């Protein structure tokens, strides 16, 4: 029987750390002193600052002391809770807060942060946490310091260094109550929109579900589109005011459609539904054209349609006849009638079983006084969509001829009467 071979042991062995993995071990104060000394030596040349930070990452433990590093770059030294600089600490003037308060200077500082975070990717999370903390400390900073931080944050949001989720800190109750959040947001959005445009800002906000929360920058008693619009328009941010107004309208439309469908499924009386819709139109400044499109969509979604083409037309006529009084209440303008016609055309084209039902629906609505002859003739002549155009125009040909003849007859009767 073979004896088991003795395995070699590792006791007494020493492994050398590769030189590039060695980091000098400091406490936060020593780390701060090293960074501040280096920044003082580079002076205000931000290119030299970026090079110094790049090289220092090989020797200093950025991962451990990320918060200290960013405190120094923004405020000039380590921040105490609340945002004040500790009196007994060393500080530097090579930082955001000591720089000039203008967009060009903040763009140059943004480049320093970009280069640093691109070089040391692991600092990304630490930097986001730092900005969230700084936003909570806003009351501890001077107005000028807030302005610089706002401009810098806007630029970093625009170039993707920061994620828009950091804006959550601005919804802090005390900051909102004292008007700090709204004032900060003005400077931030100005620099963000200056770098990109309102569409890019909207995309970033939507990604983090913040596109409908901007009114929360104000206390509850001031959270209205009117107040938001006035405040930001006067501050020179009309495009942001319009964006929020549009968001509010989109939200109101969705809410209107949802409530309409619930009312219809409950079988609420039309007079109650009409009253509710008119109130919503007034409250949210929604046009009749928008409303008729919502009602059409809601009416068509309340029923399970037959899959057989020969049966669906009859089912549609029966269903729509029932809802004609509701539709008629919101086609008081020619433009609303035309909108409805286009929605019917679109629906019949998108749902192939309805292709042959188009003309029957239009005739029903004409008889029920939902649609009148002028918008129908306009639709036929030049206001129709390209979708299924040849099929629908052919279907409507005889009815349109009848309408034209009826119109001519009524005109000649009027002339005879004169």
Curated annotation (Swiss-Prot):
The keyword Transcription applies. SUPFAM superfamilies: ARM repeat. One of its GO terms (biological process) is regulation of translational initiation. It holds the Pfam family HEAT_5MP1_2. Residues 1-14 have a biased composition (Polar residues). Residues 1-25 are annotated as: Disordered. Keywords: Activator, Transcription, Transcription regulation, Translation regulation. Belongs to the BZW family. PANTHER family: BASIC LEUCINE ZIPPER AND W2 DOMAIN-CONTAINING PROTEIN, EIF5-MIMIC PROTEIN 2. This is eIF5-mimic protein 2. It comes from Gallus gallus (Chicken). The gene is BZW1.
């Amino acid at each position: 029987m073979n004896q088991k071979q003795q395995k070699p042991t590792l006791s007494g062995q020493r492994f050398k750390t590769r030189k590039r993995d060695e980091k000098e071990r400091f406490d936060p104060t020593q780390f701060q002193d090293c960074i501040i000394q280096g920044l003082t030596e580079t002076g205000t040349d931000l290119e030299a600052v970026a090079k110094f930070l790049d090289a220092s990452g090989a020797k200093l433990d950025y991962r451990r002391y990320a918060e200290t590093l960013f405190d120094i770059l923004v405020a000039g030294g380590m921040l105490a809770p609340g945002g004040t600089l500790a009196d007994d600490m060393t500080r530097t003037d090579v930082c955001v807060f000591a720089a000039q308060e203008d967009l060009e200077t903040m763009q140059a500082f943004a480049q320093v942060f970009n280069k640093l975070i691109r070089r040391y990717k692991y600092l990304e999370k630490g930097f986001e946490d730092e900005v969230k903390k700084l936003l909570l400390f806003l009351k501890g900073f001077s107005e000028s310091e807030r302005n610089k931080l706002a401009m810098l944050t806007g630029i970093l949001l625009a170039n993707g260094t920061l994620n828009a989720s950091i804006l959550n800190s601005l919804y802090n109750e005390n900051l909102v109550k004292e008007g700090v959040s709204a004032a900060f947001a003005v400077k931030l959005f100005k620099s963000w929109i200056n770098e990109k445009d309102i569409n890019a800002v909207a995309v970033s906000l939507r990604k983090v579900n913040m596109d409908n929360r901007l009114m929360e920058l104000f206390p509850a008693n001031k959270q209205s589109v009117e107040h938001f619009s006035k405040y930001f328009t006067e501050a020179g941010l009309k495009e942001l005011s319009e964006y929020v107004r549009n968001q509010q309208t989109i939200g109101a439309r969705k809410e209107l459609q949802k409530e309409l469908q619930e009312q219809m499924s409950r079988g609420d009386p039309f007079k109650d539904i009409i009253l509710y819709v008119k109130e919503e139109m007034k409250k949210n400044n929604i046009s009749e054209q928008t409303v008729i499109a919502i009602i059409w969509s809601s009416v068509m979604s309340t029923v399970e349609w037959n899959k057989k083409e020969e049966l669906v037309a009859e089912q549609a006529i029966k269903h729509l006849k029932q809802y004609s009084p509701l539709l008629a209440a919101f086609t008081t303008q020619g433009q609303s009638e035309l909108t409805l016609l286009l929605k019917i055309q679109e629906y019949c084209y998108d749902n192939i079983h309805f292709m042959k039902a188009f003309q029957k629906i239009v005739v029903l609505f004409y008889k029920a006084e939902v649609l009148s002859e002028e918008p129908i003739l306009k639709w036929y002549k030049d206001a129709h969509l390209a979708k299924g155009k040849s099929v629908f125009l052919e279907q409507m040909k005889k009815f349109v001829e009848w309408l034209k003849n009826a119109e001519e007859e009524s005109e000649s009767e009027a002339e005879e009467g004169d």
